[in-house]
Amino acid sequence: MPLVLMYHSVDHFDEDPHLVTVSPARFARQMAWLRAKELRGVGMREYLDAHTAGRARGLVGLTFDDGYADFATRALPVLLRYGFGATVFVVTGRIGTYNAWDDGPRKPLMTADQIRTVADAGIEVASHGRHHVSLPGTDDTELREELEESRAALEELVEGPVTGFAYPYGHATPREVAAVRAAGYDYACDISPDEPQRHALPRTYVGDRDGPLRLRAKVVRHELRHRSRV
């Protein structure tokens, strides 16, 4: 099972009640640690293609949920410095606004121009739904709209295929997994799925407290937990 790291925001902060923010300095050190361990961060599409071809050794999936504006201003320059790629999961109904679903500090989300800029830089843009709702609480019509309309909006924006999805809050039952597959997504990222698979890929949370020792422990724990192939 692929090793996939899950980030959200990379920015300076005073309060972070949901632990979604990593400081720019910490993030830079985390990326430096990956490089020192001869690991290369890549987007999910590249990772899964390499995994299928048996060429995933030394690769780590890097994912960023929600599409915060600081991805373009803070995270992207560091990724480019190290020659790393990543996947950013965008909430299409909130482009250019803020994280209205969150009761924590307000954080700006990427504008359409910023999304195009990161896509042009080689970052994979994928869907995080339209409104960042917990999908198990939706009816069939709303679920289909969250999946299909968000992808259509992103494909028009980046003028290319959008093949990945990430479940908001990591909430997914077999119903949502089946719906994502039926909607034509090639893969989907979860957090800690009961039954890991290509449309419910586990990810390892990374926060501001994660220095080298904690990162190494998380990598080892992943290797022990997930030994099967996608």
Language model segments and positions:
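Active-site glycine- and acidic-residue-rich loops that bind
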Residues: 66-70, 100-109
